[in-house]
Amino acid sequence: MLDIKQLRTDFDQIKEKLAHRGEDLADFDKFGELDQKRRELIGKTEVLKSRRNEVSQQVAVLKREKKDADHIIQEMREVGDEIKKLDDELRTVEESLQHILFSIPNIPHDTVPVGETEDDNVEVRKWGEQPAFSFEPKPHWDVADELNILDFERAGKVTGSRFVFYKGLGARLERALYNFMLDLHVDEFGFTEVLPPYMVNRASMTGTGQLPKFEEDAFKIREEDYFLIPTAEVPITNMHRDEIIEGEQLPINYAAFSACFRSEAGSAGRDTRGLIRQHQFNKVELVKFVRPEDSYEELEKLTNQAEKVLQLLNLPYRVMSMCTGDLGFTAAKKYDIEVWIPSQDTYREISSCSNFEAFQARRANIRFRPEPKAKPEHVHTLNGSGLAVGRTVAAILENYQQEDGTVIIPEVLRPYMGNKEVMK
């Protein structure tokens, strides 16, 4: 949520920046009108309340003097009725304003490239060499089928499309990956490990920005106002909802492993095979709470920490700076890390690292005290995937496949897989 004071003072400048996102700004235009109406209603109400207080004092004086106060009492009732009417109108206006505030996306940072689609994203850097195969590389689902480690068909029978059973070495590879990722982030980078709930309430989904705008993308629990988490970002960020953090505690860094659940609304026909786009998948999520002046330095650090996973796995990747039209609703700036997928001859997203500035903190009322006894301010929140586990499995199966159908296990994972060197 944007700062309402900033919206009032910098309305035209903010509107210009939001226009680069390609958003419909009809609601945004209504903000100025409604905010002006709100202030007028508050002014009228305050005048009437002041008048009511004066009349109340006059009634008290007349009653003490045993004089007739009926005409003044009647005036007080009329003033009270008018106040109630204005209060009701004010409540309606404030609800409309709140709806608009919750529907306005974050303001892009000045360093975000201006563009409309993913084609306008800007490559920041590349790492690693793409493998040179002496044979036609297979897609990961075919590699997995030969190894008998992933079962999409039976998962489709048990649940439906976009689900999978991991079996044998496939399950062990998945487990090895998220344990390796957590160990790296906790032991080397100093994150605090958290195992979160997989269901959250409406306030939590609103706090991180999934609601109200993207409710159709979420899995809702019938007859309960709970949602399956689309990412551990939601419960972890909301751990500190409605809290004031002492400044010396910052930065706070959390690493969380969880299953994630997404309806993939609007993705019909895309990535219908394999692990790239599933309704349920595992992910290691990194969440940071930082001082505002440190947040962009922390974004670079967060991105490097996610990259380190791919470097240790020796998987080639590139880092992309998302343009204004591909930024996402909540981010002020976002990097996507894309891993090389040989069978598709392209890079695919495996991590997003975002700085939300105070956008989520304002929605979730997360503040910090810069100095002892100082007035609380909103923290800046960041999050990144460190990494999406299923997509990492796909990248390993494709980049490490051999002509005989076996798959070399990355060296860093071997201690997690009983020191096996090859999947066969």
UniProtKB/Swiss-Prot annotation:
ATP binds at residues 262-264, 349-352. One of its GO terms (molecular function) is ATP binding. One of its GO terms (biological process) is selenocysteine biosynthetic process. Catalyzes the attachment of serine to tRNA(Ser). Is also able to aminoacylate tRNA(Sec) with serine, to form the misacylated tRNA L-seryl-tRNA(Sec), which will be further converted into selenocysteinyl-tRNA(Sec). Pathway: Aminoacyl-tRNA biosynthesis; selenocysteinyl-tRNA(Sec) biosynthesis; L-seryl-tRNA(Sec) from L-serine and tRNA(Sec): step 1/1. The keyword Protein biosynthesis applies. Gene3D superfamilies: Bira Bifunctional Protein, Domain 2, Serine-tRNA synthetase, tRNA binding domain. It comes from the Bacteria. It catalyses: tRNA(Ser) + L-serine + ATP = L-seryl-tRNA(Ser) + AMP + diphosphate + H(+); tRNA(Sec) + L-serine + ATP = L-seryl-tRNA(Sec) + AMP + diphosphate + H(+). It holds the Pfam family Seryl_tRNA_N. Keywords: Aminoacyl-tRNA synthetase, ATP-binding, Cytoplasm, Ligase, Nucleotide-binding, Protein biosynthesis. Homodimer. The tRNA molecule binds across the dimer. This is Serine--tRNA ligase. Consists of two distinct domains, a catalytic core and a N-terminal extension that is involved in tRNA binding. Belongs to the class-II aminoacyl-tRNA synthetase family. Type-1 seryl-tRNA synthetase subfamily. L-serine binds at residues 231-233, 285, 385. The lineage of its organism: Bacteria, Bacillati, Bacillota, Bacilli, Bacillales. The gene is serS. It is found in: Cytoplasm. GO terms for cellular component: cytoplasm. Its EC number is 6.1.1.11.
